Amino acid sequence: MKTSKASQRYRSIRRNASQCYLYQDSLLLGNSDDSFNADETGDSSDPEQIFQNIQFQKDLMANIRCRPWTMGQKLRALRRAKEIVLKFEGRLTRTRGYQAAGAELWRKFARLACNFVVIFIPWEMRIKKIESHFGSGVASYFIFLRWLFGINIVLTVMTGAFVVLPELIAGQPFGSTASKTIPREQITSAQDLDTVWSLGGYLQYSVLFYGYYGRERRIGRAGYRLPLAYFLVGMAVFAYSFIVLLKRMAKNSRTSLASASNENYTFCWRVFCAWDYLIGNPEAAESKTAAILNSIREAILEEQEKKKNKNMAVTVCLRIIANILVLLSLAGSIYLIYFVVDRSQKLEQSKKELTLWEKNEVSVVVSLVTMLAPSAFDLIAALEMYHPRTTLRFQLARVLVLYLGNLYSLIIALLDKVNSMNIEEAATKNITSHWADAPTFSATRTVPEEGQWPTPGSGAELRRNTSTWVVEETSFLTSITPHTKANKTVPYMQGPQGQCWETYVGQEMLKLSVIDMLFTVASILLIDFFRGLFVRYLSDYWCWDLESKFPEYGEFKIAENVLHLVYNQGMIWMGAFFSPCLPAFNVLKLIGLMYLRSWAVLTCNVPHQQVFRASRSNNFYLAMLLFMLFLCMLPTIFAIVHYKPSLNCGPFSGQEKIYDIVSETIENDFPTWFHAVVGHISSPVVILPAVLLLFMLIYYLQSIARSLKLSSQQLRMQIQNARSEDKKKVAQMVEALAIPSDARQAGSATEAESSENSKPKTLQARIQTHEESSKRLLKDSDLISQLSSVYMATSPNNGHMLNFDSLSSKSLRMEAITRSLPQSPGQGSRDPCSPLLDGSRSRPEQDTNRHPHRPCSSTSNLHKNRSCSSVTQTQPLKDVRSEPLSRKDFQPISPPFCGSGVSTLMTHDHSPRAPRYYVVNERDSHKKTHRAFWPERHFKIDALGDIVELYPRNVQQYMSWVPNQPCSPQLSEEEEEMLRRDLVQWSIPASSLTDLPRSSCFYTGDRSENNTRDPKYQRRVYYRSGDNSFEDQLERPTFVHRKPRSRNGQYPQHALKARVKAKFEPSFTESDSVSAASSSDHQNSNNDQYLHVMSSQGRFPRSASQLGRRKAKSRQVLPTDLNDLICSNV
């Protein structure tokens, strides 16, 4: 028979796949030696075959690890695949080969470049080693330190390239101006230890501090504007820090959103998939092992914290007490720092010379408070019983508040001193102007013979009283002048030297940073190193175990150390404007801190008892750093805006405000129109709407962020639900594989018992859903779920109904239409509502019990007792097929009707027959209709007298109606032959069938005229009762049964399997599989009913008005809703 294009393509694919499989076996699994020649494999003149072989070899090389072969077979296969690709790929195109080679070369180069770049990442291997032994929480501290190191490198480059180097290269040299010259009274003590320690002497008059830089607007030949650069760089330090922090936080937020909030299969991933098989170094293997163990400990702790039960009343009370203690500690530290700063100011006013402790007591007290208070907070946090990660965050917040309180108390005290210095400077300026207006005295003397004489002069000393300033002349002979200068008139004008408050603030910030570094080194050596030595070497000689009890080995305190970095960076931001070299000093400090801390951790510290996983993004650290940056920027901005710059030092001397340098530069160095534009932009008319617009934009973006966060949570929940549904489906599949065998056994036992006790009296028409491919599911989803009741219009059966249901394929629910026969005397009857699963899962050999042996016995009350059985299908019905059962022992009553279109078995028109119900699948006229569930049938009578069904030419196989089941098992061969003759002779009188109800037949098909046959061409078969009491024309209903599971796919009762082409399969829907049996009176036997199944997008049936809009056809259509169908003459 002629096959279709799809069949040809399928066979071609199967043939190519088998050839490819044979080629794989011969190439990959063949045991050949090294003398393998690539010319013997894949050598062909066909370009398509060459391309297929090359493509296969590439796929093999890409998926060689997934092959279930030994390593030797994999290596041989990989070697041969490379040889074939290198040899034959050039036959197709050399450009593709060059591209592939270039891509491979670039991939190798990129990998080498990445490995080379890793070498330049500072302290990468050191951090990995720490992470493997101490966990990600401790490693996060060092990663954070490295990131701060990078920020300070950039800040150092900015200040050094634009401020420090131009001043050193093009500025005035040291000693040329008063701001760059050490006073004479300080020269002798400029190199003393206490002077250097207090950052005085030569350090004070150097590029380290603000006062050294000159006030010239342009320096050098290029006319570099140093004052403007100094101001812009100071603002750029804050701007760059803000931008970097926000970008890093946004990147970490995206990373944390991309990853799942809670990990699935945590322990499985860590146990089975955590090892890195590329490790070749024993030390790296040891570190990786420690890292895996530590991650498992972290996961175990996470699970334990989820299941921990707490007494909330006691916990709340302890937390309240802990917070009260923390507040008292914070208030006490702030008061102590402010008291020390105020005391130092009073000492400076009362004493001329201060001791070393009095000069540095402020920095020492601040460092002691910042070092001891976090330990007290750590002890207090033990009362709260939080999760370790939550405890860390509370500890970080408290220490942050402590550090901010210390810094602000220090800066407030410093600004108070700046106010007093400005008052003194204003008073000094007034006195200097008074001396400038006074007359100039001159003294003339004869030169003595000794060659020298004392020069008259005046020394002035300022003394502050309550309301006036008094100048007292103490002496007039202050120095000895050589006689060569004796006869000159020397004018004298001298006032008190002004002080530079910007340099003083920079000195205090740098001094605080230096002392903090020293205290950090001392705490590491004392608390960690010497403590570890004491515990290790004296534990054997002590009264108790020093390793498990006090003092034991030190633990790395993450919160304290992280906040120490934040505090240190805050000092840098606060003092960078007054000390341009402070970021460079911080770079050196961070380098030393990295090496010292890492050494102490690996040598002296032990892992924390409660190891916990650090946050994925570390945004909490960055948020604290951002908060610190904002609060440290405020004092600097306040000083720039509020205080007047010093008169005798700095690049802004002579200005009313520091920011006036910008307006002065715009006025003098830019065109007039630019100055006008800047003036309009800086006016309140523009600034206020811009600020409002920014607030609106921030609110809009925040709303979008909230909505995106909510949507991401919903999507994550959907993913989790999908995973749970997949798990349920897998469980159902496992149960479905286990159920059929048990169901078959139970069904066979039930059927055997029923056959022994009683004969079945129930004719059932079962409707089973069919689960098809995904494309078919999309089409089936459009088929509505219809439910109707057919009321029998015969006089004794009004009100009785047959229910049949057509459900969508997504619901595994079936409706069984049953008709119960009356019980014979002395026989039991089966339950008419018996479950469908028992019958559908029975073996094909046991189908004799499913169909009645005597369908026509005692049929006078056949129409009674109808019921509907609703059964839920619990397993997928992928192998369900509806086929007509074979019928035996009946002959055609007339020769086949010969026609061009239809040839069926039929009877004379005058004989009464039962009404037929055609279940028609209604489709639109513009859609292409498919064939019905079964193709149009053609019958003939073979030589043996059996009915043979002929399929059309496009059907690949025939199905012969061979004897399957005897109508009456009590008949012998002679009686069967007699039955055949009686059926042919038309020996049944019509009057004997008056009380016999006819069986209603349900047919499936499309509305199209060429697919639905006329009722008069339908097959008619005569039956005779078992006891020969009557004979009649009856239509046995078509049964839908489950396809048996067999390896060869053949039914045991059929000689040939009915194979229909795949293009007929899409027409198999729920509505097409309906077949049922019903009864009617002989008065209504000449009318056939059509049940239309409408295909629509909705879930509910169409109304009668919608059905009436369809085009009327040549047959009779029920115009009402399916729930009101009446089986009567319409």
UniProtKB/Swiss-Prot annotation:
Bias kind Polar residues: ranges: 747-767, 856-876, 1097-1106
Glycoprotein as UniProt keyword: yes
One Pfam family it belongs to: TMC
Coiled-coil segments: none
Topological region Extracellular: 170-192, 247-319, 383-393, 531-570, 641-680
UniProt topological domain (Cytoplasmic) ranges: 1-148, 214-225, 341-361, 415-509, 592-619, 702-1130
Spans traversing the lipid bilayer: 149-169, 193-213, 226-246, 320-340, 362-382, 394-414, 510-530, 571-591, 620-640, 681-701
GO cellular component, one term: plasma membrane
Glycosylation sites per record: 264
Keyword terms of this UniProt record: Glycoprotein, Membrane, Transmembrane, Transmembrane helix
Bias (Basic and acidic residues): 840-850, 878-890, 1006-1017
Statement: the UniProt record of this protein carries the keyword Chaperone: no
Chain intervals for the UniProt region annotation (Disordered): 742-774, 819-893, 999-1019, 1033-1059, 1097-1116
Compartments it resides in: Membrane
Annotated tissue distribution: Detected in most neuronal organs and also in some non-neuronal tissues.
Family: Belongs to the TMC family.
PANTHER family: TRANSMEMBRANE CHANNEL-LIKE PROTEIN 3, TRANSMEMBRANE CHANNEL-RELATED
Function: Probable component of an ion channel. Molecular function hasn't been characterized yet.
Protein name listed in UniProt: Transmembrane channel-like protein 3
The organism of origin for this protein: Mus musculus
